Amino acid sequence: MTAETIIELSGVEKRFGTLTAVRDLDLELVKGEFFSLLGPSGCGKTTALRMIAGFQEPSSGTIRIDGEDVSTVPANRRPTNMVFQSYAIFPHLDVGDNVGFGLHRSGLSRKERRARVSEALELVELGGYERRRANQLSGGQQQRVALARALVMRPKVLLLDEPLSALDKNLREAMQLELRRLQQSIGITFVMVTHDQYEAMTMSDRIGVMFNGQLEQVDTPQTLYASPGTRSVANFIGGMNFLPARLHNEGGGTLDMEIAGFGAMAVGRNPNVADHGRNALVGIRPEQLEIAAHRPEGYDSTVQCRVADIAFYGESIHYFVEVDGVPETMTVAVPNYFHSVDFTRGATAWLGVQAASVIDLGRNRDNETQQGEKT
Amino acid sequence: MPLRTDTSKGLALGAPATLYVGLLVVAPLGMLVAYSFWTQTYVAIDHSLTWENYRSAIGDPLVRHLLFRSVWIAALVTLMTVLLAYPIAYFIAFRTERKALWLLLITIPFWTSYLLRVFAWKLILGFNGLLNSGLQGLGLIHEPMTWLLYNEFAVVLTLAHAWAPFAILPIYVSLQKIDRRLLEAATDLGSGKLERFFRVTLPLTIPGIISSSLIIFIPTVGDYVTPALVGGADGKMIANLIQVQFGPANDWPLGATLSLLAMVTVGIVAVGYVLLLRFLGSRIR
Ligand SMILES: Nc1ncnc2c1ncn2[C@@H]1O[C@H](COP(=O)(O)OP(=O)(O)O)[C@@H](O)[C@H]1O
Ligand SMILES: [Mg+2]
């Protein structure tokens, strides 16, 4: 354990009867970082967070916070505080008493407590709201009260369970940036649970991606985007076109591949993939594909395609195209740049891609299971 | 006749309720008020208006005593019932998965008539009752305890038992409504179980406690069956006196006056109680 570690989970597992909600979780969080647990609904994120908070006891494994084993420490004595998904604002108390709730046992005088409360409310830009009742607050304001109520405790770790999911889109995006700024200014470690990849990407220093109770990859948003370690991660972070490929030669830094539809290319080796085989899988991000009416110049590979469908997103346009030799329809995302490209459904077009944009995803397990099923 | 305006439509829709309330609440109450200002002569009613009934009722020490005792007994019954009901409601709301079964068990006493339940207590508490003969049989006491029946204690016990389900249900509902995350939030902010109960659970169930209390208190002040059957001489309450006026004494105007006095007293005590509890609740931080 390094001096900087604030939370250390080792071999943490949680079983509910026959269901294993979290399995074999190993994780080290660094002091002052903004960490997100990202994954689809039901993958065990909340359970993991609640074990850190102390609301749920691990079936096995240990949890250390700031070097101390807290596995058997009850929730009310852990140096963590939580922002609940539904905010859990006490309806019988006003804003000031909500925020000051946890300071009763602090040994502070009434005056000091009041100062701490108003300081915390200033921090979340609710200065002067002390005497408002909880039911007079909007969703965004309740969220801030919940945040102030937790931060006023000066926890070593702040836990946030889908803190923004109940807000509407504009407010949510504003709050993402604000939460991030707040975290950077106070320097407390934040652990956030979310199923929203954009939220995790914009806010976090590092993201842990979870599926079915299993932590699949822990990395910076940039690395998760550029070098996802598994197909599920690649699929969950951003959009991805998956293409089967044949691996001919894996000497040196690049892999010589024959990619379905796109032909031979030298693909950079993905450091997060360990297992390679003759049946390979590669991915191409929709925004890394060029689409043009004529064969584009200067690309490592170009192929002809047919536009099957179009979706207009405002800031971008998605073309769903079919390419000979590629089993699944591919997605091409084009920035809506003065309508520079404009195809109609059924049109024929050209795709261009650079070898540097092709992501090596290792052995193609889909293929193997399919073959396995056949035999 | 076609309905032309929203107003007439509204009146038509509201008519049955208005009629119902008018016939069953306003009319009887109006008659009661009217009677209280009349006078009973030997066989007929003197319809000239007078405050005399009120003057003599309030001036009568027996009336004041019975009124005070009714409120006192009702307050005792309410306190005892709510104190017993709260833990039961808490158990059903938080400590068991078989809520429906427990709620059903609680209503079982209601499957028999109220009168039978009162008689059952008579059988249990009486001179040759279950309790006395049982304890004598076990050799724990040598002669029957006579203080069990025909006093305030018997009235309070019988009523507390009779009202228990009515007290449990509102408290149970208010406990059940509490968002469990609020309790977790209190724990997260450092509260132990006891502190959490007094700072979150209890204040959030004050509406339930208020409904429970009023549901018991209001009818108990006016109860006359229980005091008549198990109350003995010093268990008598105001309703017994009212019943006498409408029955044997045949003085309806005085009966009406006593009824209204009891109603006003109950009203004042109830409002004071609600305000007090609300105030206490708002003091919890
Ligand atoms: N208290 C519990 N009892 C039984 N199963 C639970 C409990 N809490 C969560 N689960 C199950 O564990 C799995 C993970 O749940 P959760 O951690 O809430 O997922 P997420 O937050 O990622 O949506 C789900 O299948 C859920 O049904
Ligand atoms: Mg969750």
Describe the function of each predicted region.
Chain A
Residues 38-40:
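The feature captures the beta-strand-to-loop junction immediately N-terminal to the Walker
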Residues 46-49, 145:
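ABC ATPase nucleotide-binding domain helices that frame the ATP-binding cleft
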Residues 56-64:
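Conserved post-Walker A/P-loop segment of ABC ATPase nucleotide-binding domains
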Residues 62, 68, 214:
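ATP-binding/catalytic-site motifs of ATP-hydrolyzing domains
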Residues 53:
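Helix-to-loop junction immediately C-terminal to a conserved catalytic motif
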